[in-house]
Amino acid sequence: SAQDESVTNVFVAPGNAGTALEPKVTNLSLDTNNFVKVENFCKEKHVELVIIGPEQPLVDGMSDYLQSKGINTFGPSQAAAQLEGSKTFSKDFFIKYGIPTAAYASFNDFDSSKNYLDTIEYPTVVKADGLAAGKGVIICGNKDEALAALDSIFKDQAFGEAGNRVV
Protein backbone atom coordinates (compact mmCIF):
# COMPACT_ATOMS: atom_id res chain seq x y z
CA SER A 1 0.00 0.00 0.00
CA ALA A 2 1.01 3.64 -0.30
CA GLN A 3 1.59 3.66 3.47
CA ASP A 4 4.45 1.19 3.15
CA GLU A 5 7.81 2.97 3.35
CA SER A 6 9.16 0.98 0.41
CA VAL A 7 6.46 2.40 -1.88
CA THR A 8 7.53 5.66 -3.50
CA ASN A 9 4.68 6.22 -5.97
CA VAL A 10 1.17 4.95 -6.64
CA PHE A 11 -0.25 5.82 -10.04
CA VAL A 12 -4.03 5.74 -10.51
CA ALA A 13 -5.69 5.95 -13.90
CA PRO A 14 -7.88 7.86 -14.15
CA GLY A 15 -8.13 8.49 -10.41
CA ASN A 16 -10.48 10.93 -8.73
CA ALA A 17 -10.56 13.78 -6.24
CA GLY A 18 -10.28 11.33 -3.35
CA THR A 19 -7.23 9.51 -4.67
CA ALA A 20 -5.58 12.85 -5.47
CA LEU A 21 -5.54 13.66 -1.75
CA GLU A 22 -3.62 10.53 -0.80
CA PRO A 23 0.12 10.81 -0.13
CA LYS A 24 2.35 9.31 -2.85
CA VAL A 25 -0.64 8.99 -5.24
CA THR A 26 -0.63 10.55 -8.70
CA ASN A 27 -3.77 10.56 -10.84
CA LEU A 28 -3.14 9.95 -14.53
CA SER A 29 -5.01 10.74 -17.72
CA LEU A 30 -3.88 7.45 -19.26
CA ASP A 31 -6.14 5.61 -21.71
CA THR A 32 -6.53 2.29 -19.90
CA ASN A 33 -8.08 0.74 -22.99
CA ASN A 34 -4.81 1.24 -24.90
CA PHE A 35 -2.71 -1.66 -23.67
CA VAL A 36 0.47 -0.51 -25.43
CA LYS A 37 0.30 2.92 -23.76
CA VAL A 38 -0.24 1.26 -20.37
CA GLU A 39 2.68 -1.09 -21.03
CA ASN A 40 4.95 1.78 -22.07
CA PHE A 41 4.00 3.84 -19.01
CA CYS A 42 4.68 0.89 -16.71
CA LYS A 43 8.10 0.29 -18.23
CA GLU A 44 8.98 4.00 -18.27
CA LYS A 45 8.03 4.47 -14.60
CA HIS A 46 9.30 1.04 -13.45
CA VAL A 47 5.89 0.05 -12.12
CA GLU A 48 6.22 -3.12 -10.05
CA LEU A 49 2.53 -4.11 -9.87
CA VAL A 50 -0.58 -3.19 -11.83
CA ILE A 51 -3.95 -3.72 -10.17
CA ILE A 52 -6.69 -3.67 -12.78
CA GLY A 53 -10.07 -2.55 -11.48
CA PRO A 54 -12.35 -1.60 -14.36
CA GLU A 55 -14.25 -4.47 -15.96
CA GLN A 56 -13.72 -3.55 -19.60
CA PRO A 57 -9.91 -3.78 -19.66
CA LEU A 58 -10.14 -7.10 -17.81
CA VAL A 59 -12.66 -8.52 -20.27
CA ASP A 60 -10.51 -7.21 -23.12
CA GLY A 61 -7.46 -9.08 -21.77
CA MET A 62 -5.27 -6.40 -20.19
CA SER A 63 -4.08 -8.73 -17.44
CA ASP A 64 -2.93 -11.34 -19.97
CA TYR A 65 -1.30 -8.69 -22.15
CA LEU A 66 0.68 -7.01 -19.37
CA GLN A 67 1.80 -10.34 -17.93
CA SER A 68 3.00 -11.40 -21.39
CA LYS A 69 5.15 -8.25 -21.39
CA GLY A 70 6.73 -9.14 -18.03
CA ILE A 71 4.66 -6.72 -15.93
CA ASN A 72 3.31 -8.07 -12.63
CA THR A 73 -0.45 -7.85 -12.69
CA PHE A 74 -3.26 -8.46 -10.22
CA GLY A 75 -6.50 -9.22 -12.02
CA PRO A 76 -8.24 -12.16 -13.64
CA SER A 77 -7.28 -13.49 -17.02
CA GLN A 78 -9.41 -12.60 -20.02
CA ALA A 79 -11.02 -16.04 -19.87
CA ALA A 80 -11.90 -15.68 -16.18
CA ALA A 81 -13.18 -12.13 -16.68
CA GLN A 82 -15.87 -13.50 -18.98
CA LEU A 83 -17.74 -14.48 -15.82
CA GLU A 84 -18.35 -10.76 -15.36
CA GLY A 85 -18.39 -9.82 -19.03
CA SER A 86 -21.29 -12.00 -20.12
CA LYS A 87 -24.29 -13.01 -18.04
CA THR A 88 -25.02 -15.85 -20.48
CA PHE A 89 -21.45 -17.16 -20.16
CA SER A 90 -21.78 -17.01 -16.36
CA LYS A 91 -25.09 -18.86 -16.30
CA ASP A 92 -23.78 -21.56 -18.67
CA PHE A 93 -20.66 -21.90 -16.49
CA PHE A 94 -22.74 -22.26 -13.32
CA ILE A 95 -24.90 -24.96 -14.87
CA LYS A 96 -21.92 -26.83 -16.33
CA TYR A 97 -20.22 -27.01 -12.93
CA GLY A 98 -23.31 -27.55 -10.76
CA ILE A 99 -23.22 -24.13 -9.12
CA PRO A 100 -26.70 -23.14 -7.93
CA THR A 101 -28.22 -20.34 -9.99
CA ALA A 102 -31.67 -19.09 -10.92
CA ALA A 103 -33.36 -20.44 -14.04
CA TYR A 104 -32.69 -18.35 -17.14
CA ALA A 105 -32.93 -18.01 -20.87
CA SER A 106 -31.03 -15.66 -23.14
CA PHE A 107 -32.21 -13.94 -26.29
CA ASN A 108 -30.70 -11.88 -29.09
CA ASP A 109 -33.92 -10.22 -30.23
CA PHE A 110 -36.98 -8.48 -28.86
CA ASP A 111 -39.63 -10.83 -30.28
CA SER A 112 -38.14 -14.04 -28.89
CA SER A 113 -37.63 -12.50 -25.47
CA LYS A 114 -41.15 -11.03 -25.52
CA ASN A 115 -42.68 -14.46 -26.26
CA TYR A 116 -40.73 -15.96 -23.35
CA LEU A 117 -42.43 -13.57 -20.93
CA ASP A 118 -45.65 -15.60 -21.23
CA THR A 119 -43.89 -18.69 -19.86
CA ILE A 120 -42.39 -17.31 -16.64
CA GLU A 121 -43.49 -16.25 -13.17
CA TYR A 122 -43.03 -12.79 -11.70
CA PRO A 123 -41.17 -11.00 -10.30
CA THR A 124 -38.34 -11.65 -12.74
CA VAL A 125 -35.05 -10.05 -13.62
CA VAL A 126 -34.08 -8.80 -17.08
CA LYS A 127 -30.36 -8.25 -17.60
CA ALA A 128 -28.24 -6.88 -20.39
CA ASP A 129 -25.80 -9.68 -21.18
CA GLY A 130 -22.68 -7.54 -21.47
CA LEU A 131 -20.94 -4.93 -19.36
CA ALA A 132 -23.32 -2.11 -18.47
CA ALA A 133 -21.39 -0.35 -15.69
CA GLY A 134 -23.52 -2.00 -13.02
CA LYS A 135 -26.71 -0.61 -14.53
CA GLY A 136 -27.85 -3.51 -16.74
CA VAL A 137 -30.20 -5.22 -14.29
CA ILE A 138 -33.92 -4.47 -14.18
CA ILE A 139 -36.22 -6.12 -11.63
CA CYS A 140 -39.69 -6.53 -13.10
CA GLY A 141 -42.77 -7.14 -10.97
CA ASN A 142 -45.03 -8.07 -13.87
CA LYS A 143 -45.14 -8.67 -17.61
CA ASP A 144 -45.73 -5.00 -18.45
CA GLU A 145 -42.58 -4.00 -16.57
CA ALA A 146 -40.64 -6.79 -18.29
CA LEU A 147 -41.88 -5.63 -21.70
CA ALA A 148 -40.82 -2.08 -20.87
CA ALA A 149 -37.38 -3.36 -19.84
CA LEU A 150 -36.97 -5.29 -23.09
CA ASP A 151 -38.14 -2.27 -25.06
CA SER A 152 -35.59 -0.10 -23.29
CA ILE A 153 -32.77 -2.57 -23.87
CA PHE A 154 -33.47 -3.68 -27.44
CA LYS A 155 -35.24 -0.74 -29.03
CA ASP A 156 -33.87 2.24 -27.12
CA GLN A 157 -30.39 0.70 -26.78
CA ALA A 158 -30.32 1.82 -23.12
CA PHE A 159 -27.15 -0.20 -22.49
CA GLY A 160 -25.57 0.05 -25.94
CA GLU A 161 -23.87 -3.10 -27.19
CA ALA A 162 -24.17 -4.66 -23.72
CA GLY A 163 -27.87 -5.08 -24.52
CA ASN A 164 -27.47 -6.92 -27.82
CA ARG A 165 -28.43 -10.01 -25.82
CA VAL A 166 -30.56 -10.24 -22.69
CA VAL A 167 -30.81 -12.82 -19.93
Please provide the spans of the model-predicted regions.
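ATP-binding N-terminal substructure of ATP-dependent carboxylate-amine bond-forming enzymes
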Residues: 1-79
